[in-house]
């Protein structure tokens, strides 16, 4: 794949372009209110030049956090490899302005040690591979991507602690852990002397499981929160207002089961879209602002298939406030849509 070879110089006004930065829990680290996730759109099925344009635009608008995982693609590993190529080409001079994260927890390579989980062997080896793919000496944040009930939590957290002490990550986090397991993880890491920086759960208007006890837990423990899938795998965009378009995630059965797009579910989405229009926002912009209404949420992770889509999402930051009446009206339609694919991890 090819990419632009012209010299990239970051916009001089990138920190005056409307980005909001929030403190991550009780740490000393700030994150942008909207971060760029590379779960989709950065594999080998997307032209490298398009990926490059998205990364350049994101940084030019003050997005300093890029979130990856070992298995992002397709194929597995390709998002990290492509990011590494573009980082070396465009972003290496700005390394100290960036927060780059990766994760490990799902199947990645053949044999018993690459099938995922939370073993020390898998996590350390996986991060070493990620660093090699991205051409980095360290990541800023490394996550346990899921809770593994077959591995002692002490081993998983011990691996994260040793990764920090080895200089391979500055901070550590967890993803899709329940409230009680999060408290356990915090306690184990605290005893080791390595604080848990951040939790990455799925959270959106149509997937509100974190409100049961996780957000309270994170606040109590001083842990930040970065919400992934805040647009409900695309349901909270204009994409599905009139059905399932060709090429969409639902049409391709990628992370969004088309069976979930029932008449009832779409009626709620259309009602929310009407409220967004009254606010002068797109549905996606209102959905992002809604996730960020709670100051316990440090950042919302968005994906982008184009510069235009990225810009639309970032423009959510111009209108973050809601009236009590607006929130009450939204609650009538912000109902569970059965889209939490990660519930098996957070159910323990």
Residue ranges and their predicted role:
Residues 1-98:
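N-terminal binding-site loop/beta-alpha segment at the start of enzyme catalytic domains
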Residues 3-18, 147-332, 337, 347-348:
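Beta/alpha (TIM)-barrel catalytic core signal, keyed to glycine-rich beta->alpha loops juxtaposed to Asp/Glu
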Residues 46-50, 78, 82, 114-122, ...:
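Alpha-helix N-cap and loop-to-helix initiation/capping positions
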Residues 45-58, 118-134, 182-186:
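Short, acidic/polar
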Residues 32-33, 67, 93-98, 137-141, ...:
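Short acidic capping loops at alpha-helix termini that bridge into adjacent secondary structure
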């Amino acid at each position: 794949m090819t990419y632009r070879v012209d010299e990239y110089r970051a916009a001089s006004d990138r920190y005056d372009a409307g980005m909001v930065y929030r403190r991550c829990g009780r740490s000393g680290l700030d994150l942008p209110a909207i971060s760029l996730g590379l779960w989709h759109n950065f594999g080998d099925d997307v032209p490298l030049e398009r990926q490059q344009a998205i990364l350049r635009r994101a940084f030019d608008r003050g997005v300093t956090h890029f979130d990856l995982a070992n298995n992002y693609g397709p194929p597995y590993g390709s998002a990290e490899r492509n990011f590494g190529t573009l980082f070396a080409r465009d972003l290496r001079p700005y390394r100290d302005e960036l927060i780059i994260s990766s994760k490990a927890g799902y199947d990645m390579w053949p044999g018993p040690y690459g099938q995922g989980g939370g073993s020390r062997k898998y996590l350390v080896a996986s991060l070493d591979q990620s660093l090699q793919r991205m051409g980095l000496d360290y990541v800023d944040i490394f996550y346990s991507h899921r809770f593994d009930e077959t591995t002692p939590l002490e081993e998983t957290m011990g691996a994260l602690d040793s990764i920090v002490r080895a200089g391979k990550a500055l901070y550590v986090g967890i993803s899709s852990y329940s409230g009680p397991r999060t408290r356990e993880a915090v306690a184990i890491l605290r005893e080791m002397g390595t604080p848990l920086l951040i939790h990455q759960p799925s959270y959106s208007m149509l997937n509100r499981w974190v409100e049961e006890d996780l957000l309270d837990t994170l606040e109590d423990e001083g842990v930040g929160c970065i919400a992934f899938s805040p647009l409900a795998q695309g349901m909270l965009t204009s994409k599905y207002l009139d059905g399932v378009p060709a090429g969409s995630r639902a049409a391709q059965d990628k992370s969004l089961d088309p069976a979930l797009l029932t008449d009832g579910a779409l009626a709620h989405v259309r009602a929310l879209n009407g409220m967004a229009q009254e606010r002068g926002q797109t549905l996606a912009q209102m959905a992002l602002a809604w996730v960020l209404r709670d100051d316990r949420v440090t950042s919302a992770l968005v994906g982008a298939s184009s510069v235009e889509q990225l810009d639309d999402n970032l423009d959510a930051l111009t209108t973050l406030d809601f009236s009590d009446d607006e929130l009450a009206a939204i609650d009538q339609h912000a109902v569970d849509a059965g889209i939490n694919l990660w519930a098996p991890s957070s159910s323990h």
